[in-house]
């Protein structure tokens, strides 16, 4: 040990890292190869960060400007070394980067990784960005020696993955001139990763398109042999790129191990020139519903990585992975310039249009592939209906919805409009949390009796976009839980064609009595033409949000003093008929019955009785009376 390396700091991993390392060491993954792709990806990132910092500080490159990644195989000592000449790390960066997981989603990762076991393990590693720790899948000890470019100190990080790690200074003679060297002391069952054939195959399959050349040193002291030339895939002609090439590149840029559901590769020419390579993932990224809703498209200038925070796509396309490369921006572009640049505004518009158009074409040419994309990302795309006024019509046409149609398949609005009933002037919808509960909703009864299709909307964003999208193809959207149903002008199906019962005088009197009894608990009580089987239901008044949106806003504390619901009564229901003919002098019983009807409507609406104790007492009194008769 050198004199410099006499002071050794010992640190304990934070709890989440310790747990993660335990999972890695005990290897819940069947595919061990993933560790190499992760470490190469980290090395390539380090090289690109150096290229970026060297724009304003070219002295960082010294006399060695060319980026490279070198893999050294040491079969005799069962070691694999991954070395890059990138930006490198200082002491604090080593502790921060390798001792903690400084990102959200770790707990969710733990839960999923433990549940997954061998299933989908490789994909989870990339999804959660914990690639370095995958080294412990194959190594029982890991040494990291790093020297940050432009500094005169080097540092050694070491761990056996059992709960702690050490950090110490190291002689410059024992460190890279700049960059990072990772030495994996391989487990007995992982010694195959010192085989030239094995490592070269993995590199070509998984990392052949990283924008940094990769070489293999077959044994210590041997000459390096290049196995990947660092050519940027997106600069090639599409005719030169195979499907496997695209898949390998996607896995690198997206950090996922599935296959892309859709690839969009184009070059825009004219006033502004840029190349874009974008992928729609084959599965949901873990951070799809992260509150920050950040995109992951990377911005390159002349093949130099600049940032992945340029917001090159709207938030409702945040699941798209890939990059844009342009030569029309300066390499030292600032964050402010990125936000204000007319070029980037043009890129955002062009890229968004191309991605949406490509998804539309897929919907026409391969409905099965599109259905998978919609299943994974439809709830996110629909955010755009609410947020993107310019493309609202396009997004509505692209969207698919569950409906009351017999085939139970997601439907396009264009198909819905084509099959509207004679006399139907609106697109009807019902919002809620649960599809099964929506299908059992009493508010649907009158629509089913007339064969009117109703959209069943279960995504939280559905309750918002329907309030901002005025219509589709000239047909307004109308909630079946808000205002009057106005179904009288639409004929019922033959099997439900019996005339709707008129509200007789007794029912009219009972409605008035119910209105008086309930008072301010409801905004109104009225007979309904939307009910055919149930006795009662709740709907929202004509003005204000529908029932589901009102609940969401109240739960979030966004509204106070919301309008009370309307209690609708089915005049043809035998219970209503019996109550309507109940002697008026039996007022206490009738009041109990009316309040029980309101609680029944609340339960049918997915709520609970407002006062459970009073509900139970009323129920007992009504049961008691019934048993005496």
UniProtKB/Swiss-Prot annotation:
Keywords: ATP-binding, Chaperone, Cytoplasm, Nucleotide-binding, Plasmid, Stress response. Residues 336-551 are annotated as: B. Coiled coil: none annotated. The keyword ATP-binding applies. GO terms for molecular function: ATP binding; ATP hydrolysis activity; ATP-dependent protein folding chaperone; unfolded protein binding. It is found in: Cytoplasm. Residues 1-335 are annotated as: A. InterPro entries: HATPase_C_sf, HSP90_C, Hsp90_fam, Hsp90_N, Ribosomal_Su5_D2-typ_SF. Homodimer. Molecular chaperone. Has ATPase activity. NCBIfam families: PRK05218.1. This is Chaperone protein HtpG. It comes from Rhizobium meliloti (strain 1021). The lineage of its organism: Bacteria, Pseudomonadati, Pseudomonadota, Alphaproteobacteria, Hyphomicrobiales.
């Amino acid at each position: 040990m050198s004199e410099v390396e006499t002071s050794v700091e010992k640190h304990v991993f934070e709890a989440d890292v310790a747990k993660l390392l335990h999972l890695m060491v005990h290897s819940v993954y069947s595919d061990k190869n993933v560790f190499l792709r992760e470490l190469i990806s980290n090395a390539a990132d380090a090289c690109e960060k150096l290229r970026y910092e060297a724009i304003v500080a070219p002295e960082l490159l010294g006399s060695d400007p060319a980026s490279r990644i070198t893999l050294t195989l040491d079969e005799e000592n069962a070691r694999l070394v991954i070395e890059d000449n990138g930006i490198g790390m200082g002491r604090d960066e080593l502790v921060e980067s390798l001792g903690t997981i400084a990102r959200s989603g770790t707990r969710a990762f733990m839960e999923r990784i433990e549940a997954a076991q061998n299933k989908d393990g490789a994909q989870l590693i990339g999804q959660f960005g914990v690639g370095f720790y995958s080294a412990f899948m194959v190594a029982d000890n890991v040494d990291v020696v790093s020297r940050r470019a432009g500094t005169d100190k080097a540092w050694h990080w070491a761990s056996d993955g059992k709960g702690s790690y050490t950090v110490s200074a190291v002689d410059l003679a024992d460190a890279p001139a700049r960059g990072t060297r990772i030495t994996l002391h391989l487990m007995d069952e992982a010694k195959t990763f010192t085989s030239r054939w094995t490592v070269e195959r993995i590199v070509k399959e998984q990392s052949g398109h990283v924008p940094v050349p990769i070489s293999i040193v077959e044994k210590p002291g041997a000459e390096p042999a290049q196995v990947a030339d660092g050519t940027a895939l997106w600069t090639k002609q599409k005719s030169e790129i195979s499907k496997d090439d695209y898949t390998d590149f996607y896995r690198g840029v997206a950090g996922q191990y599935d296959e892309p559901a859709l690839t969009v590769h184009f070059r825009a020419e004219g006033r502004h020139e840029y190349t874009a390579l974008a992928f729609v993932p084959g599965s949901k990224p873990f951070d799809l519903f992260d509150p920050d809703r950040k995109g992951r498209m990377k911005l390159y200038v002349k093949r130099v990585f600049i940032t992945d925070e340029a917001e090159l796509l709207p938030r409702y396309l945040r699941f798209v992975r890939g990059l844009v490369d342009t030569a029309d921006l300066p390499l030292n572009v600032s964050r402010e310039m990125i936000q204000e640049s007319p070029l980037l505004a043009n890129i955002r518009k062009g890229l968004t249009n191309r991605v949406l158009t490509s998804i539309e074409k897929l919907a026409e040419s391969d409905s099965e592939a599109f259905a998978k994309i919609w299943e994974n990302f439809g709830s996110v795309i629909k955010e755009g209906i609410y947020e993107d006024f310019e493309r609202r019509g396009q997004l509505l046409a692209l969207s698919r919805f569950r409906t009351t149609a017999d085939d139970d398949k997601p439907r396009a609005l264009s198909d819905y409009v084509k099959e509207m009933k004679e006399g139907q002037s609106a697109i009807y919808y019902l919002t809620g949390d649960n599809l099964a509960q929506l299908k059992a909703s009493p508010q649907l009864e009158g629509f089913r009796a007339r064969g009117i299709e109703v959209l069943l909307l279960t995504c939280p964003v559905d309750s918002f976009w329907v309030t901002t999208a005025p219509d589709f193809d000239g047909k307004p959207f109308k909630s079946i839980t808000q205002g009057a149903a106005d179904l009288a002008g639409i004929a019922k199906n033959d099997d439900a064609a019996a005339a709707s019962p008129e509200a007789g005088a007794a029912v009219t009197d009972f409605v008035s009595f119910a209105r008086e009894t309930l008072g301010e608990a409801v905004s109104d009580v009225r007979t309904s033409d939307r009910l055919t089987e149930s006795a009662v239901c709740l709907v929202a008044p004509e003005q204000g949000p529908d029932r589901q949106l009102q609940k969401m806003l109240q739960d979030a504390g966004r509204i106070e003093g919301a309008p009370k619901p309307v209690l609708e009564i089915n005049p043809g229901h035998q219970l209503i008929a019996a109550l309507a003919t109940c002697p008026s002098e039996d007022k206490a019983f009738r009041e109990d019955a009316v309040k029980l009807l309101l609680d029944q409507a609340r339960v049918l609406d997915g709520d609970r009785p407002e006062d459970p104790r009073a509900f139970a007492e009323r129920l007992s009194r009504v049961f008691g009376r019934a048993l005496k008769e």
